[in-house]
Amino acid sequence: MGRSNSRSHSSRSKSRSQSSSRSRSRSHSRKKRYSSRSRSRTYSRSRSRDRMYSRDYRRDYRNNRGMRRPYGYRGRGRGYYQGGGGRYHRGGYRPVWNRRHSRSPRRGRSRSRSPKRRSVSSQRSRSRSRRSYRSSRSPRSSSSRSSSPYSKSPVSKRRGSQEKQTKKAEGEPQEESPLKSKSQEEPKDTFEHDPSESIDEFNKSSATSGDIWPGLSAYDNSPRSPHSPSPIATPPSQSSSCSDAPMLSTVHSAKNTPSQHSHSIQHSPERSGSGSVGNGSSRYSPSQNSPIHHIPSRRSPAKTIAPQNAPRDESRGRSSFYPDGGDQETAKTGKFLKRFTDEESRVFLLDRGNTRDKEASKEKGSEKGRAEGEWEDQEALDYFSDKESGKQKFNDSEGDDTEETEDYRQFRKSVLADQGKSFATASHRNTEEEGLKYKSKVSLKGNRESDGFREEKNYKLKETGYVVERPSTTKDKHKEEDKNSERITVKKETQSPEQVKSEKLKDLFDYSPPLHKNLDAREKSTFREESPLRIKMIASDSHRPEVKLKMAPVPLDDSNRPASLTKDRLLASTLVHSVKKEQEFRSIFDHIKLPQASKSTSESFIQHIVSLVHHVKEQYFKSAAMTLNERFTSYQKATEEHSTRQKSPEIHRRIDISPSTLRKHTRLAGEERVFKEENQKGDKKLRCDSADLRHDIDRRRKERSKERGDSKGSRESSGSRKQEKTPKDYKEYKSYKDDSKHKREQDHSRSSSSSASPSSPSSREEKESKKEREEEFKTHHEMKEYSGFAGVSRPRGTFFRIRGRGRARGVFAGTNTGPNNSNTTFQKRPKEEEWDPEYTPKSKKYFLHDDRDDGVDYWAKRGRGRGTFQRGRGRFNFKKSGSSPKWTHDKYQGDGIVEDEEETMENNEEKKDRRKEEKE
């Protein structure tokens, strides 16, 4: 990255003339667009995505406006967007990673970095096609945008230099062979060199590639593809009659086209220096690949490099067809490979570029190109036929087989042209796809080995195996082969597609040996990529003539053939594996018959099974001569009769019985229902009550207190009173709950103001009687009042389990105006109850005193002492301590003065009584 910052603008300029200006204008508009809140995901998305910033920085991560825009972008005095929609940077500081707007140096790379989106034709074609030769092909920007040497990617930088070197190295060879020079210049000006030619090539290639990859033409049009100065798609038919040459070339081009895209996408070095030079021919002008042109074009010294890249290249290109898997894989691997290959090739060029004997390199190049072509063409057939032309020369079956393959190829072309969907394509594509996937993986593995090995260019791809020959021998052979191939292609062209078709179909059906051949070849080719070295060893043993693995042909009419191989399947497989053997003419009708025969065999098989079933049934499962229909109807009838028979008596009986029984039943049912409902109601009541544990406890307390007599000593009077009250129905409690709230508050205020000094016992008694009268209404209210006041009578202790309703807990706290408040909050429990272990363990947990009485007095006293606190502000209940009851505070406050228990109780009771009176 840093590399280019220094040259920020220059990088954009020279090589990129078009693209830069275009992108600049684009970015202006983009700026406008950015003011929309969405941050224009379209552009920014992919671009920023390739540089993987952590999400926060990716400007488009999820709109991440909130994350960084306000801070990073915000200019001086603007609110979110005021004055600044898209011009984030204008006023504010520009974070580096964002410097991606028109002026930023970054753009150099960011533009090219977005292969995923624009990979094929959209932007790139826009920028390239206009001034394509000027800008895009210039050495510097060989892969239009990416490679500007300044652009950040190290690969591209290297590439730039590499290209220069390559060019130097090639200076001489270029003069030598015009064709070659063309191929080398092509990277620079693919489109400069006469358009007619490129168009021509394009037609050929696109046509053929159209056949091969029916979808390919879309790719071909992209200016990136070597062959389309103008996207002209030729109808496949033209190509169908084309010679082997275009065929070969298309195999390359079909493969290379994608590879070109992928290169541009991945900045493959090949696009630029080495590829352009080395494989230049195969890449850019398919016509030169064709065997006819093979001889000169392949031979640049750079060739030495190209092959290293080529396989990778091809695999990359191919895989780029399958964008899902391939692109990603290749994008990753491609970068590294490219880097690696660039370095190596650079070195290689320097060392060998000039020194290598041009002649040798040429021949090797052609030979290599040949081999490459052969094993690149992983499509079973194209790959095959090319090989065949070479192979069979060695095997002396030259003429027939190559012709065959050629015919087949033409046949296939025509078929494909007619029905883009034909099986051949599908299966062919599959094989290719597999091949490609495999290749792209393999090429990684093989790449080092193959680089080393291939430098010697001495592979000859033979039918027999990869026979490794010394270049000297191979050169001659290759020349001859080239001639042969030319001858053959000419011959082939003459054949009419119809003948071819018929022959082909003939061949289709004898598929065994070719199948084998194809598989063999395919295996070999992948094998070769995988480990060229091993191939060397293998070469010796796998001479095809000796080791003949024959696949026993499965006769089509064999009745045992599994149904799975039905007509379509066979047809497809045979089409794919065109058979090279049978040359004699067989009318197409034979073939038609054959698949039918196979179909009929499956039918006959079914028929056979059916008859067997019938036979068995007749023999072993004889049924009474009843038809199924009869049998089932009889079942139905029987069931109907049965039901009717049963039904009528039942009905009558029911009628007879019903008046009494039904009445009985209904009565019982009604009672049950009533009972249930009552239970449910009761349950509901219980449930409601008990839903709140506190209610439950209160209820229990009530019940218990009922049993205990009211006649308890004055000491217990308040307790007993409470007991009387508690039994009251809970409903009343509920109804008075609210009242009690208000009353409670009033009580507190009043009682707090009323003096705490004890009044005479008599007055207290009066009050008690009044209270008892009130009990009905106040039951719970009282309970509540006293609850807090547990301190007065012994029971006081328990209330430390904060037992009251939730409100109560707090009331008590610091505000406790003596027992008064606390009364309001906690229900006081009668003495006996208090010690109920169920409720209150008399534990030191709650009291610091072991002695209960002390505790009581202490509490009462404390309460009283505290009472003064609130008296002044009588009106308000201070629930000061929120949730903790009095005892928590007291617990920590020392024991205070222990008063006489009686006295405290009396005082408290007095207070209670007084309060009640006031209430009344």
From Swiss-Prot:
Q: Which residues carry this modification: N6-acetyllysine?
A: K152, K332, K421, K437, K475
Q: State the Gene Ontology terms under molecular function.
A: DNA binding; RNA binding; transcription coregulator activity
Has the keyword Acetylation been applied to this entry? yes
Residue ranges, annotated region (Disordered): 1-437, 464-502, 637-796, 810-840, 862-920
Any one GO CC term of the record: mediator complex
Q: Please outline how this chain is modified post-translation.
A: Citrullinated by PADI4.
| Covalent cross-link (Glycyl lysine isopeptide (Lys-Gly) (interchain with G-Cter in SUMO2)), residues | 188, 332, 413, 421, 437, 457, 462, 491-492, 501, 536, 548, 550, 567, 580, 593, 599, 622, 676, 778, 784, 831, 911
Localization, UniProt: Cytoplasm; Nucleus; Nucleus speckle; Nucleus, Nucleoplasm
Where are stretches of biased composition, namely Acidic residues?
A: 397-406, 897-907
User: Ranges of Basic and acidic residues compositional bias?
Assistant: 47-63, 160-196, 353-373, 384-396, 472-502, 638-656, 668-750, 763-785, 908-920
Q: How does it assemble?
A: Interacts with Bcl-2 related proteins, EMD, with the adenovirus E1B 19 kDa protein and with DNA. Component of the SNARP complex which consists at least of SNIP1, SNW1, THRAP3, BCLAF1 and PNN. Component of a MACOM-like complex, named WTAP complex, composed of WTAP, ZC3H13, CBLL1, KIAA1429, RBM15, BCLAF1 and THRAP3.
Q: What does this protein do, in the record's words?
A: Death-promoting transcriptional repressor. May be involved in cyclin-D1/CCND1 mRNA stability through the SNARP complex which associates with both the 3'end of the CCND1 gene and its mRNA.
Q: Which family does it belong to?
A: Belongs to the BCLAF1/THRAP3 family.
Would you tell me the protein name for this molecule?
Bcl-2-associated transcription factor 1
Organism expressing this protein natively: Homo sapiens
